UniProtKB/Swiss-Prot annotation:
Organism: Dehalococcoides mccartyi (strain ATCC BAA-2266 / KCTC 15142 / 195)
The entry's keywords: Ribonucleoprotein, Ribosomal protein, RNA-binding, rRNA-binding
Protein name listed in UniProt: Large ribosomal subunit protein bL20
Domain of life: Bacteria
GO cellular component: ribonucleoprotein complex; ribosome
């Protein structure tokens, strides 16, 4: 009986790995063994960084809100505290978008937060 080496399956798997490493440098996109190592690392980084992106975005929103709040004479903490006291439940993503694209509405929200903080 002839030995079965899995030629078609192996070829497909190799093609898939080489396709995934298309933009990689040097042997990492042309030799299967190096390409597979490169792909495993790349996928690992992609997995971790998809989760890290959530924190990156939150930090960006907070930075934008803080900058807009300081333009209104409040700090980020004072603004958030005032919003909580006033019972205004707007998340950071919406607040940051408002600060960038609709500064008039953000100023109105900040004024309500300042009034609630003063009382």
């Amino acid at each position: 009986m002839a030995r079965i080496k899995g030629g078609i399956a192996t070829h497909k798997r190799h093609k898939k790995v080489l396709a995934l490493t298309k933009g990689h440098a040097s042997a990492r996109h042309s030799l299967f063994k190096r390409a597979h190592e490169s792909m495993v690392h790349a996928m690992s980084y992609a997995f971790a960084h998809r989760r890290a992106r959530k924190g990156d975005m939150r930090r960006l929103w907070i930075t934008r809100i803080n900058a807009a709040a300081r333009a209104e004479g409040l700090t980020y903490g004072e603004l958030m505290s005032g919003l909580k006291t006033a019972g205004i439940d707007i998340n950071r993503k919406v607040l940051a978008d408002m600060a960038v694209s609709d500064s008039v509405a953000f100023a109105a929200v900040a004024a309500k937060a300042a009034a609630a903080k003063a009382n």
